[in-house]
């Protein structure tokens, strides 16, 4: 069980890798959203033993390059509603402290605590296929 918390910003992100009970496998570090940096993170994750889940907040469009990269690589990626993360952080943090590093730790910790409730991101092609099936079911049920 390995949770990768990514605090996404414009052009860069802060990444923290945690195991259960708050064990930090990789201290928070910054990375750019370039292909070289994403491949380096992918290489790091491939060296880890255990099931990996990548967790990030939805941030308008800024999270999309990271989301797409890791989804296409076959990772379990979960995109969290910012309001849910804000509530979680409020309920679980020491008041006043807010930095990108602390946010990445908080997001990774959210991934550990909500491990079995995390929803895996489905790519657009999967969503459109499901909508197509739903549309067919609706037509079949009305005829």
Predicted regions and their residues:
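Phosphate- and other anionic-substrate recognition elements at nucleic-acid/protein interfaces
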Residues: 1-143
């Amino acid at each position: 069980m390995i949770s990768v918390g990514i605090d996404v910003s414009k052009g860069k992100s802060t990444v923290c890798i945690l195991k259960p009970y708050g064990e930090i496998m990789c201290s928070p570090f910054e990375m750019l959203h370039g292909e070289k940096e994403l491949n380096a993170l992918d290489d790091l994750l491939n060296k880890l033993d255990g099931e990996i889940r990548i967790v990030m907040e939805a941030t308008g469009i800024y999270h999309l390059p990271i989301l797409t990269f890791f989804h296409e690589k076959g990772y379990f990626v979960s995109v969290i509603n910012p309001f849910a993360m804000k509530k979680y952080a409020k309920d679980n943090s020491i008041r006043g402290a807010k930095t990108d590093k602390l946010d990445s730790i908080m997001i990774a910790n959210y991934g550990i605590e909500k491990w079995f409730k995390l929803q895996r991101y489905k790519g657009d092609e999967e969503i459109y296929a499901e909508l197509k099936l739903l549309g067919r079911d609706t037509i079949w049920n009305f005829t």
